[in-house]
Amino acid sequence: MMRLKEKYNQSIKPALVKEFDIKNPMLIPVIEKVVISVGAGELAKDQKVLQNVADTISLIAGQKAVITKAKKSVAGFKVREGFPIGVMVTLRKENMYAFLDKLISIALPRVKDFRGLSRDGFDGRGNYNFGLDEQLMFPEVEYDKILRTHGMNISIVTTAQNDKQAQKLLELIGVPFTKGK
């Protein structure tokens, strides 16, 4: 599953150096980490469902997910301090490349009527965020073992100086963006 890392080292790095005229090799944009998170909302009230969500995210990521807890109480959301509110996992190195490879080559093509990811998900600092509506597009997830379908947020953190560099890096890796802009 190291296809993506080899592709990055052999063809993407030289292309980025050439396009952005980067003199210092330490300034070549690289993907630092990928964070997958699920805000449980109503699902958090049922511990069994929340554990099922954590298990599903662990299957998808290939690494154990952590149940996140509220840092402080918010009456408007009916949340108390220490109350479980979501699930997250941070992927780095080999797990990150394996997940991105699976996402780009297997999961996203399985989405019905998929036209590409929006280019609006860049944050101005070279990071990209997007959401997926359901977890069933991943091959590890079995429909029968799911208690409730849920979406997830995926954040790709890069060392790019700006959005233009980050977008080019992700395009070269193979992230399917929508046409235009």
Curated annotation (Swiss-Prot):
Cellular component terms (Gene Ontology): ribonucleoprotein complex; ribosome
MF annotations from Gene Ontology: rRNA binding; structural constituent of ribosome; tRNA binding
InterPro entries on file: Ribosomal_uL5, Ribosomal_uL5_bac-type, Ribosomal_uL5_C, Ribosomal_uL5_CS, Ribosomal_uL5_dom_sf, Ribosomal_uL5_N
Record-level GO BP terms: translation
The UniProt record lists the keyword Nucleus: no
Database matches in Gene3D superfamilies: 3.30.1440.10
NCBIfam families: PRK00010.1 (NF000585)
Function text: This is one of the proteins that bind and probably mediate the attachment of the 5S RNA into the large ribosomal subunit, where it forms part of the central protuberance. In the 70S ribosome it contacts protein S13 of the 30S subunit (bridge B1b), connecting the 2 subunits; this bridge is implicated in subunit movement. Contacts the P site tRNA; the 5S rRNA and some of its associated proteins might help stabilize positioning of ribosome-bound tRNAs.
Similarity comment: Belongs to the universal ribosomal protein uL5 family.
Protein name according to UniProt: Large ribosomal subunit protein uL5
Originating species: Campylobacter jejuni subsp. doylei (strain ATCC BAA-1458 / RM4099 / 269.97)
Lineage summary: Bacteria, Pseudomonadati, Campylobacterota, Epsilonproteobacteria, Campylobacterales
